[in-house]
Amino acid sequence: MPTLLLGAAIPFGTIAYTLVVFLILLVMLRKFAWGPLMGIMKEREEHVASEIDAAEKNHAEAKKLVEEQREMLKQSRVEAQELIERAKKQAEEQKDGIIAAAKEEAESIKTSAVQEIQREKEQAIATLQEQVASLSVQIASKVIEKELKEEDQVKLIRDYIKEVGEAR
């Protein structure tokens, strides 16, 4: 007669056989299913972790590159502003140089014109002195040639003044 376990109608041999088969199944599942499944899960976990690390590294590198680009853009703006300031300063210096050269040239032209006017004035004075001397000699020679009355003297002076006016 079969041995009963705890008064139940389950034979002890069946329980032992089921327990042995279950343990063998557990060992086989652990070896062929649980181990590879856990290995795959571990690989997947490591892969996901490495992907997260790579994404974090890429994100950090992208942030760094963005910051570098911002810094380069800022530097470019500063350099552009400096270039503009240098160009303005150079243009201002050129303007001042051109104005100074124009003033100097105007002063030179003015000085030259004043000298030319002075020469022409001196030449005109010299010419007038020669004409006055010549007229004086002519008047004196005519006076000597004839003795003049007051009326003749006035007429002679008017004639000579008229003659000098026509000569001009």
Swiss-Prot record:
It is found in: Cell membrane. One of its GO terms (molecular function) is proton-transporting ATPase activity, rotational mechanism. The chain crosses the membrane at residues 9-29. It comes from the Bacteria. Gene3D superfamilies: 6.10.250.1580. It is a single-pass membrane protein. One of its GO terms (cellular component) is plasma membrane. Coiled coil: none annotated. SUPFAM superfamilies: F1F0 ATP synthase subunit B, membrane domain (SSF81573). It holds the Pfam family ATP-synt_B. Keywords: ATP synthesis, Cell membrane, CF(0), Hydrogen ion transport, Ion transport, Membrane, Transmembrane, Transmembrane helix, Transport. HAMAP family: ATP_synth_b_bprime. Belongs to the ATPase B chain family. F-type ATPases have 2 components, F(1) - the catalytic core - and F(0) - the membrane proton channel. F(1) has five subunits: alpha(3), beta(3), gamma(1), delta(1), epsilon(1). F(0) has three main subunits: a(1), b(2) and c(10-14). The alpha and beta chains form an alternating ring which encloses part of the gamma chain. F(1) is attached to F(0) by a central stalk formed by the gamma and epsilon chains, while a peripheral stalk is formed by the delta and b chains. F(1)F(0) ATP synthase produces ATP from ADP in the presence of a proton or sodium gradient. F-type ATPases consist of two structural domains, F(1) containing the extramembraneous catalytic core and F(0) containing the membrane proton channel, linked together by a central stalk and a peripheral stalk. During catalysis, ATP synthesis in the catalytic domain of F(1) is coupled via a rotary mechanism of the central stalk subunits to proton translocation. This is ATP synthase subunit b.
